[in-house]
Structures are given as C-alpha cells and as structure tokens.
Amino acid sequence: VFALVFSAVAACSGPRDHAQILMPRLSVPWSESVRILGDSVPGKTFYSDFLMIRDKMTPARWHAVGIHKSMNTLYHAVADSLFGEWKLQPDIVSTDSVVRMWAPFAIWSPRGDSAYMYYHHGLGPDGGDMWNSMRVLAAAGPDLDRWTKYDVYAEQEAAPGVRNIVFTGPVPRDACIFFDESLDKYIMYYADDAPRAIQARTSDDAVHWSEPVPVMGIPDPQEAFVTPESPFVIRRDGLYYLFVSGFDYARVALYVSEDPFDFGDPIANKVGEINGHAPEIVKENGHYYIACAHIASEPGMAPGAADLWGTYLQELVWSPATEAESAKIFRKDRK
C-alpha cells in the first residue's frame, strides 16, 4: 500500500453539484492491463497483498514488497519506472518461526531519511493464535534496499520482548497510512476482526498510534463481503475515498466521505464497485495508477479464488460522478 501524501486540491465546503465531484474508474479490464510481477499460469507463482513506494535516492525507481510463497517472508522487487521491468531482489525474511507475515505498507518517515514498513504478524509458535500483532520495520537508508526491525520502545526502559510490535489485536492487517494535511496527523486504516470493521488510528510521528475507532462495518445482510480486507484511502478535493476488498476477490467496494473517521452505512453509502483485489494506488506525474494482485476477473468465483495470477497495473481514471453516486457520499451534515 503506497506511502504518498494525498493532499486536497480544494476544500469541501458544503454540497457540490455531482458533476464537480470526480469518481475513480478502471481504464481497462484487468485482463488487458499490464502484468508487472508473477506468472499468469494459475498456481505457478503466488503473489498477493503488497505495497508500492518510490525511491528517494533514484526518484524514478519504484519498490514493491508483498506476500508470496509460504507467507512468512515478503518478496522485494524494484523497477526503474512503474511500467518498466520489475526485478526480484532478496526476500525480506522474517527471523521468527511464526507464519502469516501479511500485507505490508510503507510510508516515509517525517524526516524523509527512512521509511517505515508495517505488516501483520501472527503471535504464538505457529501464528495460529486469535490475538495477533501489527509490527514495523525501518529502511536502513533512503534507497530502501535493506530493512531492519524498528524499536518502537527505544525511549522506554521497560518494554515488550518483541520491540517492533506497534499494537496487538484480533488479526489487525492490511494497513494503509497517509499524512492528512488538514488534520496535521498521520492516519492508519486497517482491517480487524473484533469488531469486523475497518479501523482508523492517528499519529504525530507515524510510529506511536492512538486507540482505534471503527470507520466502516460490514453489511448486514452480508452481501458485499463477510470480512473486510485491504482498505486503501486517498484524499482528493476535500473528500476521502475508501476502497475495501472482501470475501469476493473480484470486487472492491468504494465509499466516499467528507469525514475520514466515518464512511457511513456499508450498504446505503456504497458508491459503487470496481473489479480487483487488494488495491494499491500510486500517483506519478499527475496521474493515478492502481495495481491489484490475485484477481478474480468476474464476480462469483469461490472465496479466495482468482483467475489472474500475479500483480497487474493500469491507470486509474477520474470522471464526474453521476447523480446517484453523489447521493451516496457520506456528508458530515447528515449524521
């Protein structure tokens, strides 16, 4: 999930005509997009939830880090441009015996000389405990080539044995973080299982986080997803766009809100859906791009199934909202 500050172009001051509000759309079907990692043959290679972040030593160079193999290591790939040749580097390996090293996300530190990588990690000898952790690594330098465990408790004499645990909870996973200039805070969005919801936390330093608040629950009846997954939030023109995956790997639900901590009702305020799974959204030269991995190209496949293996990338285009879409945006004055 990409570490970029998405700032508002214009403040959202009261209701706007739907034609003034932009909605994200896929530019092509995923089968016509560019596969940047993995093999198209089902089962040959496994790539799933991942992050993308741009290098500060070589500004055109991009890094991707994500789930593969047995899911207790993270792959690392680099490319000289978004649509260039992605080359695999040595894995970022967990030194623990615990399985389930999931869904990384990286964001540059406030000083800009390093980056923090958040990931879900199981607790217990086999990672099977219900209670799990959100952990953090730090880049050894601005080239992002080497990552080490970050000591969250460096200033405390008494600290947990595993010092890179940021917080624990019932399967906290799939973090997405950005700096919200309007709040002067970092916001982390992530999926959780108790409650089954998308949660949000805030931070001044991108390391120490507030208590969580739920920003989006699951539908009841469970039409769109059973367990929320892979939230991704961007802020554009004073609005917050929440992309959230779920049980069906073919669908990503879209919600739009004026409030970063409340996206309304999961059914009534669902603006729409796009095809895909575990989206990562990046911005380069004024254009937005969306990447997804392990995609079901058509809704209705078995849970967790996909027919497009690997990681795919395409431009995310924006067009005026329809009147029906605009009506589902969550407004602060409608609380």
What are these regions (language model features)?
Residues V1-V9:
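Bacterial N-terminal signal peptides
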Residues C12-K335:
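Carbohydrate-active catalytic/glycan-binding domains of CAZyme proteins
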